[in-house]
A protein has these predicted regions:
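Mid-chain, well-packed structural core segment of small domains
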Residues: 58-93
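N-terminal, charge-rich interaction modules
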Residues: 1-29
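Short, glycine-rich nucleotide/cofactor-binding loops
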Residues: 47-58
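Class I S-adenosyl-L-methionine
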Residues: 104-127
Length: 127
């Protein structure tokens, strides 16, 4: 299995929603081997959004809130590391966690995807 997909706990959920993926993740998207959507068209067990700004993160959270199939669905936001030489962002782990908490999500797991990207997994908070 692709090492990034393994880190993201991908277990064959289908279809998958991937939002705003940078070009260097083309190979990872191809490794999914399931239908991959880049715009929400239903319900998903696995959603991955790439955000370089707070506004992008909030937009992805709003899409995910409607698109996640159920409480077991996996939702990740990938964001540039502070040490990235390629990307600039106004996000980090703590600010992303606090921001999405306001939209009904709780950050539960953090992984490093590569030298430029980290990802934080969120679960919907039951209301």
């Amino acid at each position: 299995m692709n090492p990034i997909l393994k880190k993201l706990q991908f277990k064959g959920q289908s279809p998958v929603l991937v939002l705003a993926a940078p070009a260097e993740f083309k190979e990872t998207k191809a490794a999914l081997e399931v239908p991959v959507h880049v715009a929400a068209k239903g319900r998903y067990g696995f959603v991955l959004g790439f955000a370089k700004s707070r506004a992008e993160a909030v937009a992805h959270a709003k899409v995910a809130k409607k698109a996640l199939a159920d409480q077991r669905s996996v939702f990740w936001i990938a964001y540039p590391k502070g040490s990235s030489k390629k990307y600039q962002a106004d996000l980090n782990r703590d600010s992303l966690h606090a921001l999405l908490e306001q939209h009904g999500f709780d950050g539960v797991s953090l992984v490093a995807l590569d030298e430029d990207w980290s990802a934080l997994r969120f679960k919907q908070v039951e209301t």
